[in-house]
Amino acid sequence: MRLLLALFFVLALVSPSFTQVWSNCGTAADKFQITNVVLDPPTPVKGQDITISASGILDETVTGGNVAVKVKYGFITLINENVSICSSQDPLACPIAAGDYQKNMTEMIPSDAPSGKYTGNVVITDQNNAEIACIDVDINL
């Protein structure tokens, strides 16, 4: 669940209203294109729920692969995980067919999360180790 929360949190930051804190570290050949992201409330608040709704288009079927997530608070690494996209932690079952995707998720932002600068990187690869998507994040909480 922690990995899923990190993935959706990073994905949420690709919304156009958050363009100052995220960058696409992928290439034009990436297989997943994000079409819309909505946060409610629009700014995460410690101790409150946040609902993230995200949609996008996957260009081709994915039968396996990995998600590498790294989240840091300052220079301290909080999350450094590499898991199968077909694992039980993933919200989709493999194979993942090409097409449109819409996911909604509500999570609580921990009230004891330290204030400060957080950075993150998510790289998703397919069964051939080809990049599906890559996002870098830089945010202050």
UniProtKB/Swiss-Prot annotation:
<keyword id="KW-0325">Glycoprotein</keyword>
<keyword id="KW-0732">Signal</keyword>
<feature type="glycosylation site" description="N-linked (GlcNAc...) asparagine">
    <location>
        <position position="104"/>
    </location>
</feature>
<comment type="function">
    <text>Catalyzes the intermembrane transfer of phosphatidylglycerol and phosphatidylinositol.</text>
</comment>
<feature type="glycosylation site" description="N-linked (GlcNAc...) asparagine">
    <location>
        <position position="82"/>
    </location>
</feature>
<dbReference type="InterPro" id="IPR036846">
    <property type="entry name" value="GM2-AP_sf"/>
</dbReference>
<dbReference type="InterPro" id="IPR003172">
    <property type="entry name" value="ML_dom"/>
</dbReference>
<dbReference type="GO" id="GO:0032934">
    <property type="term" value="F:sterol binding"/>
</dbReference>
<dbReference type="Pfam" id="PF02221">
    <property type="entry name" value="E1_DerP2_DerF2"/>
</dbReference>
<dbReference type="InterPro" id="IPR014756">
    <property type="entry name" value="Ig_E-set"/>
</dbReference>
<keyword id="KW-0813">Transport</keyword>
<comment type="subunit">
    <text>Monomer.</text>
</comment>
<keyword id="KW-0445">Lipid transport</keyword>
<feature type="signal peptide">
    <location>
        <begin position="1"/>
        <end position="19"/>
    </location>
</feature>
<dbReference type="GO" id="GO:0015918">
    <property type="term" value="P:sterol transport"/>
</dbReference>
<protein>
    <recommendedName>
        <fullName>Putative phosphatidylglycerol/phosphatidylinositol transfer protein DDB_G0278295</fullName>
    </recommendedName>
</protein>
<comment type="similarity">
    <text>Belongs to the NPC2 family.</text>
</comment>
<dbReference type="InterPro" id="IPR039670">
    <property type="entry name" value="NPC2-like"/>
</dbReference>
